[in-house]
């Protein structure tokens, strides 16, 4: 069968952009813990020796931004000046202001069910059946590689590893869409000065790549690129500045689905960039899990200050078992996609976001938008 290739990448929790995402979501969680109705838009910038936390917040809560920031950086593993970034000595600037009352006017309502969207925008949710978590394989295994890198770094299996790392996996697909195998694997990891290139390659292959990637998809044709530049000592915020919201494809579907452009981290659930993207994933996953399609991409859009979505559309890439018009009707009947409705449906007004900020927001069963609790109702209503 003819084959085509598809590639996705991921980055570790120590990547500068992911440091920023985790700080933003740690601040959000701390505020939501005290004030579930808070309005939060928290942005973070990190560079050598400095973290700047800014944005707009309206809340009755008080949180210690400096302590939250230092704790987050420490948990990631930047704890010594030898790494170029130290949780205990970096400067922290707090430039958070209040949310515009013009936005509040459009969002808040006497009847919370009529809460308007916090902004206009379009969001996508996607699912397919090529993995047991209904996610594309390239992004799933890219995440697993850098997650494994973090584990063997923290448990000292490979004590010379440092926090910054990137992965990339290229899958080969048959013409019918089934997986033929893995064509290429890239893993670049920051390391200490004292490890040789040979030991690094062996350690990464034996302790990271082989335990993660299924042997059935590997062959003698599979290509491996482990630290292909030969040296990756300078990394983290010293190597590159980091910014919240700059890894939106890593956070979602690795490029296999479209993206509306809005980032997630640092945003409370009134921001449909985040909450509606989670709800769209919930819808798409339940449609695929119910057997109504093998692949499903749902688009939803909003106008600022308006509760009802301005559009809902579905693309199943020719894999639907029922008419797409029926799928849209099922979505409208079984899922409340108004901002208040989806926040209630998925119980989003609580501190659950920091753990989303590294290794992907989707395909992880601990999150409420990954539940498949609508499967039976969808099948029954579709007549299956």
Curated annotation (Swiss-Prot):
InterPro entries: ADOMET_SYNTHASE_CS, S-AdoMet_synt_C, S-AdoMet_synt_central, S-AdoMet_synt_N, S-AdoMet_synthetase, S-AdoMet_synthetase_sfam. Its cofactor is Mg(2+); K(+). The keyword Ribonucleoprotein does not apply. It catalyses: L-methionine + ATP + H2O = S-adenosyl-L-methionine + phosphate + diphosphate. It is found in: Cytoplasm. Pathway: Amino-acid biosynthesis; S-adenosyl-L-methionine biosynthesis; S-adenosyl-L-methionine from L-methionine: step 1/1. ATP binds at residues 15, 164-166, 231-232, 240, 246-247, 263, 267. Its EC number is 2.5.1.6. K(+) binds at residue 43. Keywords: ATP-binding, Cytoplasm, Magnesium, Metal-binding, Nucleotide-binding, One-carbon metabolism, Potassium, Transferase. Binds 2 divalent ions per subunit. Binds 1 potassium ion per subunit. One of its GO terms (biological process) is one-carbon metabolic process. One of its GO terms (molecular function) is methionine adenosyltransferase activity. L-methionine binds at residues 56, 99, 240, 271. One of its GO terms (cellular component) is cytoplasm. It holds the Pfam family S-AdoMet_synt_C. Mg(2+) binds at residue 17. Gene3D superfamilies: 3.30.300.10. Catalyzes the formation of S-adenosylmethionine (AdoMet) from methionine and ATP. The overall synthetic reaction is composed of two sequential steps, AdoMet formation and the subsequent tripolyphosphate hydrolysis which occurs prior to release of AdoMet from the enzyme. NCBIfam families: metK (TIGR01034). Homotetramer; dimer of dimers. PANTHER family: S-ADENOSYLMETHIONINE SYNTHETASE. This is S-adenosylmethionine synthase.
